[in-house]
């Protein structure tokens, strides 16, 4: 099919966006993290963190617009996130008072807590009768981005505090609900998970911005 000269060139814009995203991903994952300076690694994980949170927000909005009417919104808003038990700074003052290694550890713990759920989320979205290819591809991408971000943070922590590791947090009990044949139950769990993922990626993004400003620019930013 031949395109007319007046047809909007959306394909070019989408291609540029895709290339930009791919380059950002390759910057964080192509070369071993130990070869980068800590400053460069901070810069790249902050960029990846911001992108990951933006992606999580888009996925949540897309899911809510398509499936929001099939879930009980009031009850879901009261449902706690599975990461709620992870102790984190509650406000800006506590974030700035926290030690760098502690902010890194809690960020790692939050991301680790999403590794297992994301595997089940991807499988559940793949079987949604009314799901879209975009929702599935974005969810898969979230899984990859969070893994890349986790690896970058673990490298930074190993430099800030050699031998330190984040707390192991793997408790998650709702995977069986994602396999439910009841549409409302399944969509309800997905809605909570996408909402919580948006919340947690935003929290990690804020922590990393503080760390970058403090540890790389001595708070002159």
From Swiss-Prot:
Q: Which GO terms describe its biological process?
A: cell surface receptor signaling pathway; female pregnancy; mammary gland development; positive regulation of lactation; positive regulation of receptor signaling pathway via JAK-STAT; response to nutrient levels
- Lineage, top-rank taxon, reads Eukaryota
UniProt keywords (A-Z) are:
Disulfide bond, Hormone, Secreted, Signal
User: Which InterPro entries did the record assign?
Assistant: 4_helix_cytokine-like_core, Somatotropin/Prolactin, Somatotropin_CS
**Transmembrane parts of this sequence:** none
PROSITE patterns according to UniProt: SOMATOTROPIN_1, SOMATOTROPIN_2
Extent of the signal sequence = 1-30
Compartment list: Secreted
Q: What name does this protein carry?
A: Prolactin-3B1
For this protein's source organism, the top of the classification is: Eukaryota, Metazoa, Chordata, Craniata, Vertebrata
């Amino acid at each position: 099919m031949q395109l007319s000269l007046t047809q909007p060139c959306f394909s070019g814009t989408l291609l540029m966006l895709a290339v930009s995203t791919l380059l950002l991903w390759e910057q964080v994952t192509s070369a071993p993290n130990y070869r980068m300076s800590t400053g460069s690694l901070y810069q790249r994980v902050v960029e990846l963190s911001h992108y990951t949170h933006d992606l999580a927000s888009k996925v949540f909005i897309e899911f809510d617009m398509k499936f929001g009417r099939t879930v009980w919104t009031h009850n879901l808003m009261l449902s706690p996130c599975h990461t709620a038990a992870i102790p984190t700074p509650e406000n800006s003052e506590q974030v700035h008072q926290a030690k760098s290694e502690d902010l890194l550890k809690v960020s790692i713990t939050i991301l680790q807590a999403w590794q297992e759920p994301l595997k089940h989320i991807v499988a559940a979205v793949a079987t949604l009768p009314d799901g879209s290819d975009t929702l599935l591809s974005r969810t898969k991408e979230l899984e990859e981005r969070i893994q890349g971000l986790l690896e970058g943070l673990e490298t930074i922590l190993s430099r800030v505090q050699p031998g330190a590791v984040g707390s192991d947090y793997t408790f998650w009990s709702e995977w069986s609900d994602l396999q439910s044949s009841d549409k409302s139950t399944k969509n309800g769990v997905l809605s909570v998970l996408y909402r919580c993922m948006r919340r947690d990626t935003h929290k990690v993004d804020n922590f990393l911005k503080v760390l970058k400003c403090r540890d790389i620019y001595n708070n002159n930013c």
